[in-house]
Amino acid sequence: MDIIIKNGTIVTADGISPADLGIKDGKIAQIGGTFGPAGRTIDASGRYVFPGGIDVHTHVETVSFNTQSADTFATATVAAACGGTTTIVDFCQQDRGHSLREAVAKWDGMAGGKSAIDYGYHIIVLDPTDSVIEELEVLPDLGITSFKVFMAYRGMNMIDDVTLLRTLDKAAKTGSLVMVHAENGDAADYLRDKFVADGKTAPIYHALSRPPRVEAEATARALALAEIVNAPIYIVHLTCEESFDELMRAKARGVHALAETCTQYLYLTKDDLERPDFEGAKYVFTPPPRTKKDQEILWNALRNGVLETVSSDHCSWLFEGHKDRGRNDFRAIPNGAPGVEERLMMVYQGVNEGRISLTQFVELVATRPAKVFGMFPEKGTVAVGSDADIVLWDPEAEMVIEQSAMHNAMDYSSYEGHKIKGVPKTVLLRGKVIVDEGTYVGAPTDGQFRKRRKYKQ
């Protein structure tokens, strides 16, 4: 064996069992039994042995609001690794007038040889011409089997219902999954412009201009369109009770509907946008955070298996230099917040609080993402033959989240001051230790592009 991990407690979505495991050639080669000599033995006494986290919603090196986000693939993926995530699926954005394959080539140039962990792409379809819709048929051959469209941001990302129907229909026939940002963009634009005309320009009006009904209306419409063409659909960052109700109604009708939520919607509320000294701008992301009641709805949905995953929606806009552009007009605040490093630690607090079980935690942050997005069982579990993407987790370790302890390129954490119990200590990527007792020891060439299998209904 190359590495033996001894005395740990293996936790998968299916169960919990104390067992030693052996790693050979980047794969889990043996669980339990007697082991021969190894190049290295790691003592995992008192620690859980989790599969590496999988974050299927990140925006790295994204360009919006006439600027580029702070994190590069190098910094974002080191942060992810230190938080216990060993694979991300990033949003690769098509440029208008260009093909989807050109977008892939652009992202390859940004990520190739510069990623500390494994990575894949969803493609954001911004310019859905006839030729682009036809491209959906060939992208699965490149290992890209998911696409994202927006029902918001007219003039930037927003597509109409006919285009959404065509995209859903074509993707379903080619084994791909369409991910939808569900907000009624026209309603949101109308409300935000009305607020500004009335002199209401503070960050809180970002949330007030995108109320739950704006999200729920688009969610209901997207689900209905998927139903019309009998296509699977994945609603990204579901935030509120009204949208959840629409999801449940669609499921009851037999719609093949999946949905995620994100860490920020479990812990932050719209009240955070009213923090003094323009601090509320840090919490301007879309959809906006909601209420404590909505948080309870989301936690219950996670516990009951209705929501598929918890992602980060990591998008690294600095407070100074990005967010502060909107001091006089909330519409100029770049939408998004960091979170790829904090995700596992924050979701794990749900275990401590009795909201979800230990196995459900693994299901939400690793196993289900791998299954939905075509990476299981190579990733997302601890099993013989799987990639040795492993996190040794100390359930008793405590910390207070501070940006100074994070590994990204940011100047704040969305979860600054949160008290945490349970942290990743050692992280392995395909059998290589990349985080050793909290210290990053990997290299920017460790990560590999991950081809994903077609989606199966």
UniProtKB/Swiss-Prot annotation:
| Keywords per UniProt | Hydrolase, Metal-binding, Phosphoprotein, Zinc
Specify the superkingdom: Bacteria
Q: Does the keyword Acyltransferase apply?
A: no
SUPFAM superfamilies, from UniProt?
A: Composite domain of metallo-dependent hydrolases, Metallo-dependent hydrolases
- Any note on cofactor binding? Binds 2 Zn(2+) ions per subunit.
Enumerate the residues binding Zn(2+) 2.
148, 181, 237
What residues bear Phosphoserine in this entry? 69
InterPro entries, alphabetized: Amidohydro-rel, Hydantoinase/dihydroPyrase, Metal-dep_hydrolase_composite, Metal_Hydrolase, Metallo-dep_Hydrolases_sf, Urease_alpha_N_dom
According to the UniProt record, list the residues that bear N6-carboxylysine: 148
Q: How is it modified after translation?
A: Carboxylation allows a single lysine to coordinate two zinc ions.
Binding-site residues, Zn(2+) 1 = 57, 59, 148, 313
Record family assignment: Belongs to the metallo-dependent hydrolases superfamily. Hydantoinase/dihydropyrimidinase family.
Q: How does it assemble?
A: Homotetramer.
> Under what name is this protein listed?
D-hydantoinase
| Lineage, opening ranks | Bacteria, Pseudomonadati, Pseudomonadota, Alphaproteobacteria, Hyphomicrobiales
